């Protein structure tokens, strides 16, 4: 059986007995570009304490792509795994935020 690496670096780090490091960042392109080249295992786009903007989240994910890193590594796994923290699911019935974030391309959800 051939061992494969995980697309989600956070899960991979914990699965190997390590500690996964991540940081919360705003949903903006500058943060996406800066954090994509960081040494974090993952980043969490903050959507709970700021307006939910699925278009901005999509742009952030696009700007995280490093085509050279993908070509050099022969893997589509991102260097830094993107997650999204969604707004609280209260009386507003906001579960759809999780679906939107996952459909846009995040690798996981942080529930408040």
For every predicted segment, state its role.
Residues 1-112:
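Expand to "…catalyze enediolate/carbanion chemistry for C-C bond making/breaking, isomerization
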